[in-house]
Regions:
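Short, low-complexity, charge-dense intrinsically disordered segments
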Residues: 184-191
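Surface-exposed, charge/polar-rich loops and edge strands
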Residues: 2-183
Length: 191
C-alpha cells in the first residue's frame, strides 16, 4: 500500500546555481514510480505517494537521475507524514515560545555518527542556538539566518551526514499538505 512521503532536496534553485524547473523535477519522481507528485515552492520540496519498495531506494534513485539529467549533485532527504508530525510536535524552541519566523529545521539524511553531536560548539554563533534530535537539528536564529555560522557544511562535517534546512513556516505548510492527502479518499483505480 502506498503512503505519503516528502522529499527535501538540498541546494536547488538558490540563486543562479542548480536550477531545476519544478515540472521537470516532478517528472523525475513520476518516472521513478511515484504517484500524485506535487512540488511546493521552488526550493525542492516534493510530496508524493509511493509504495515501500520504491521509497526505500528513492533518495539514491532521484539523486542519480538529477545528476544525469541536470548535471547537479543534489542530496535527497525523505520523510513520512508520521515523521513530519513528530518534527513539528517535538520542536524544543517552539515549546519555549520562540517566534515562528526565527525557527528552522535541518533535516538529515541519516542519524549522526555516535557521539558526533558532542563535537558541536554550542557557542559557535550566539545568540543563535541549535538542538540535535534524532535525524533533525532544530535551529533558532534570532540574529538572522544569513549571518549564522551554523551552516549545513558545519553540521555535515561534524556529524558525518548531510542536511538541508527549511524554515518553520515551510515545515508546517509541508505537514499540512501531507495531512490533507491522508484525509482525501482516493479511487482505487487512480494513477
Amino acid at each position: 500500500m502506498s503512503a505519503t512521503h516528502l522529499a527535501l532536496l538540498r541546494g536547488i534553485n538558490l540563486g543562479p546555481k542548480n536550477k531545476i524547473p519544478m515540472p521537470d523535477l516532478a517528472e523525475v519522481f513520476t518516472k521513478a514510480g511515484c504517484k500524485d507528485v506535487r512540488t511546493y515552492i521552488q526550493s525542492g520540496n516534493v510530496i508524493f505517494e509511493a509504495i515501500p519498495e520504491i521509497s526505500i531506494r528513492l533518495p539514491e534513485l532521484i539523486a542519480k537521475e538529477i545528476q544525469k539529467r541536470f548535471g547537479h549533485k543534489v542530496p535527497v532527504v525523505l520523510r513520512t507524514t508520521g515523521e513530519m508530525r513528530e518534527v513539528v510536535r517535538e520542536n524544543p524552541f517552539f515549546k519555549e515560545g520562540a517566534a515562528e519566523d526565527i525557527l528552522h529545521v535541518m533535516f538529515l539524511t541519516d542519524l549522526p555518527k555516535p557521539g558526533a553531536a558532542k563535537s558541536l560548539d554550542p557557542d559557535r554563533s550566539p545568540p543563535n542556538r541549535f538542538m540535535v534530535r534524532g535525524k533533525e537539528i532544530y535551529l533558532l536564529f534570532p540574529a538572522g539566518f544569513a549571518r549564522t555560522k551554523l551552516t549545513s557544511s558545519y553540521f555535515d562535517s561534524k556529524l558525518g551526514t548531510i542536511g538541508t534546512v527549511r524554515s518553520w513556516r515551510t515545515v508546517t505548510k509541508l505537514l499540512e499538505l501531507m495531512k490533507e492527502r491522508n484525509l482525501t479518499p482516493r479511487r482505487r483505480d487512480a494513477k
